[in-house]
């Protein structure tokens, strides 16, 4: 279903544009890209080291109507926002040749550090990351890890 919905929109695009186009119908966006340090890079399921990380999130409330519609069709789910995030991001990651990871799942990934590196955010005295445009109305719903094969010929994060 996802390929039918967005496949034609992303098939011929560079990776960064394909990620943005795939996330947009769900009110999500690529929030930042980073190339992880080899020693701290998360491993993919095949055991290789990830070569690029795309943080996926929302800024403002654009995702909220999409999530609410989904939630009305899936009542009674525990942790509905986490479940929705997985239902959206996992198939997009697979379609684009990546793997999804989430802040709610083990092994824990350093989303706060990734956000500071990818978006240049600084923690407030309380430890919260406050975005210069969105303030506290932003969040990281997941990340897509890409291996060397998925990023071949592209410059992740470059327009």
Regions found by a protein language model. Give the residues of each.
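Auxiliary alpha/beta "docking" domains used to position bulky ligands
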Residues: 2-158
């Amino acid at each position: 279903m996802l390929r039918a919905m967005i496949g034609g929109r992303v098939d011929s695009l560079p990776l960064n544009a394909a990620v943005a186009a795939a996330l947009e119908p769900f009110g999500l966006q690529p929030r930042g890209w980073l190339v992880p340090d080899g020693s701290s890079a998360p491993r993919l399921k095949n055991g290789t080291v990830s070569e690029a990380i795309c943080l996926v999130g929302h800024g403002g409330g654009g995702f909220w109507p999409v999530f609410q519609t989904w939630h009305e069709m899936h009542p009674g789910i525990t942790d509905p926002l986490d479940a929705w995030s997985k239902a959206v991001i996992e198939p997009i990651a697979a379609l684009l040749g990546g793997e999804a990871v989430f802040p709610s799942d083990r092994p824990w990934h350093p989303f706060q550090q990734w956000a500071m590196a990818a978006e240049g955010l600084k923690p407030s005295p309380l430890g919260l990351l406050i975005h210069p445009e969105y303030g506290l109305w932003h969040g990281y719903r997941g990340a897509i890890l890409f291996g060397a094969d998925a990023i071949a010929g592209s410059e992740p994060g470059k327009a």
